[in-house]
């Protein structure tokens, strides 16, 4: 059986770190290879007031993830998205995440669906609900 390969947004990793079961289970399943953007790593580790214990916990979680660096294909997709959808400063990070999903042909798993629904080129994976 082929592995499931989602690109997770920062919120999914934060949920897993908080112990939210569907997110936590995602990182434990053998049939799933979890990917994230290098930007997600930066967002997690540059949190204001991040303590060393929390930083280690984040690094442990990230050790279970394939981190994708920004390469030429991602840069090209990012440029295409900016040209198509406009250059809004608040959306740059989202466009990098979307460009990564697009360039690597990975479905995006995020609870921040409103940030990505207008980008028709990417596939948004169904996501769990947090109560």
What kind of feature is each model-predicted range?
Residues 30, 61-63, 119-120:
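Short, structured coil segments at secondary-structure junctions
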Residues 1-36, 46-59, 131:
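Short, well-structured N-terminal submotif of metal-dependent ribonuclease cores
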Residues 98-131:
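Acidic, metal-binding active-site segment of PIN/NYN-like and related structure-specific nucleases
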Residues 13-14, 45, 117, 125:
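Nucleotide phosphate-binding site architecture
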Residues 12-13, 40, 74, 96-97, ...:
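Alpha-helix capping/helix-boundary segments
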Residues 9-10, 44, 78, 101, ...:
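Generic structural signal for small/hydrophobic residues in well-ordered secondary structure
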Residues 4, 67-111:
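Active-site neighborhoods of divalent-metal-dependent phosphate/nucleic-acid chemistry enzymes
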């Amino acid at each position: 059986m082929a592995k499931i390969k989602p690109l997770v947004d920062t919120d999914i990793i934060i949920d897993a770190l908080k112990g939210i079961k569907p997110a936590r289970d995602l990182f434990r399943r053998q049939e799933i290879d979890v990917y994230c953007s290098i930007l997600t790593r930066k967002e997690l580790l540059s949190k204001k007031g991040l303590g060393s214990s929390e930083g280690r916990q984040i690094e442990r979680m990230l050790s279970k993830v394939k981190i994708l660096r920004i390469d030429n294909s991602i840069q090209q997709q990012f440029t295409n998205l900016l040209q198509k959808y406009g250059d809004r400063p608040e959306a740059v990070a989202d466009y990098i995440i979307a460009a990564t999903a697009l360039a690597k042909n990975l479905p995006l798993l995020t609870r921040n669906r409103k940030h990505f629904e207008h980008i028709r080129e990417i596939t948004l994976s169904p996501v769990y609900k947090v109560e």
